[in-house]
Structure formats: structure tokens, C-alpha cells
Amino acid sequence: MSDFRQDFIRFALDKQVLKFGEFITKAGRKSPYFFNAGLFNDGLSTLNLSRFYAKSIQQSGIQFDMLFGPAYKGIILAAAAGMALAEQGRNVPFAYNRKEAKDHGEGGTLVGAPLKGKVLIIDDVISAGTSVRESVELIRAAGAEPAGVAIALDRMERGQGELSAVQEVAQQHGLPVVAIATLKDLLGFLENSPELAAHLDAVRAYRAQYGVDD
């Protein structure tokens, strides 16, 4: 496991974004862990998160010209990732959408730089894939090309069929999806963290029941 992925998991635990216990997912499954990126909710944690996104994006090798953040969580994530990339010497434009169109000021649903070239979508997780699908439609309608999707965590679990939500997005839209960390990374972290050993069997069992191959 790359050091930055291990660092990200530790960071998420420290911020209580990642928790262990018994949780019910949207799909009604009993999960031994819970990830809530909305708890990266202060300046310093958002700055650190943005640097993890930038590292993951650069390591992925995905070619892109700009960033797009789907409303609402993706808005701050795209802006922050753009700042972190600039900090590392890669300055790219970013844009985001509104849920409701404005009929005054700049109008419309899109805000920020014009959508041009290859556009990388930034979001926290992929659940049903609705946000990505809407983003792809917006990007293509503007005459630009979706380049891929960058997320914080890939749970690597099946949706309604045999594929995970991430795999479904990759297959349906022909896009690469890069995650800062995955369930596989989380298991590796637990295996090397004696203080968290009590949670390892539950996470392994969850992956055995609902997991997909990477």
C-alpha cells in the first residue's frame, strides 16, 4: 500500500470521518465501518484532503485539462483539489454546477471556468453513480470530454449486480476512476495496526460477503 494511502486512512480516522462499529448502509447492509467525507469540515482538514486528492490524481496518470465538481460536495472538493494541484505546479481551471438554474447574473447551472477539453470529475464517493452520470451529461452537452473521476474512497462492494458502483461507472461511461484509498487499502492498514485488530475480522467478513475483485 502506498504511504500516502496509509496516511489518508490514518487522517480519516483522526478526523472521525472513518469509524468502526455497526452501521447500516443505504443499501440496507450492516457495515463494520462508516466513511463520511462531510466531516472534513474545517480549513486545515480540507487543505490536507485536497493534497491527498492531488497526489492520487497525479499518480493515476489520467490526462485532463480542468476539474469539475458536482453539486454539492464536489464543489469544495474540486476547488480545493485545484488549489493543491497549483501548489504542486499544475494550475488548471475548475467549474461546478448548481442544482437550480439562475435567471440573473451569470445565469444557467454552470459556474466557474468554461467546460473545455478533457474534464476530470471530483467527488467524495460513488454510491449509485447518479452524480457522475449527470456530470458526464453536462460536460458532453458543453462540447467537452469527460476524462475520469477522482474520489476519496472506493468501498469495493457490489451494487445490485455483480459489479461495484465504481466498476459500473467505469463500464457505463468508459471512464477511469481513481480513489485515494480503497477497501483493500483499509484492510492492509488494519492488518498493520494492532490497536485496531478487533475490527479486522468484521471488515474481512464484509468484503467476503459483498466485495468485488479489484
Curated annotation (Swiss-Prot):
Q: Which family does it belong to?
A: Belongs to the purine/pyrimidine phosphoribosyltransferase family. PyrE subfamily.
Q: Does the record's keyword annotation contain Membrane? A: no
Q: Which organism is it from?
A: Chromobacterium violaceum (strain ATCC 12472 / DSM 30191 / JCM 1249 / CCUG 213 / NBRC 12614 / NCIMB 9131 / NCTC 9757 / MK)
Q: Name one GO cellular component term.
A: cytoplasm
CC cofactor = Mg(2+)
State the CDD domains in the record.
Answer: PRTases_typeI (cd06223)
InterPro entries linked to this entry: OPRT, Or_phspho_trans_dom, PRibTrfase_dom, PRTase-like
The pathway is: Pyrimidine metabolism; UMP biosynthesis via de novo pathway; UMP from orotate: step 1/2
Q: Which residues bind 5-phospho-alpha-D-ribose 1-diphosphate?
A: 26, 72-73, 98-99, 102, 104, 123-131
Does the keyword section mention Repeat? no
**Enzyme Commission designation:** 2.4.2.10
Q: Write down what this protein is called.
A: Orotate phosphoribosyltransferase
Residues annotated as binding orotate: F34, F35, S127, R155
Q: What does this protein do?
A: Catalyzes the transfer of a ribosyl phosphate group from 5-phosphoribose 1-diphosphate to orotate, leading to the formation of orotidine monophosphate (OMP).
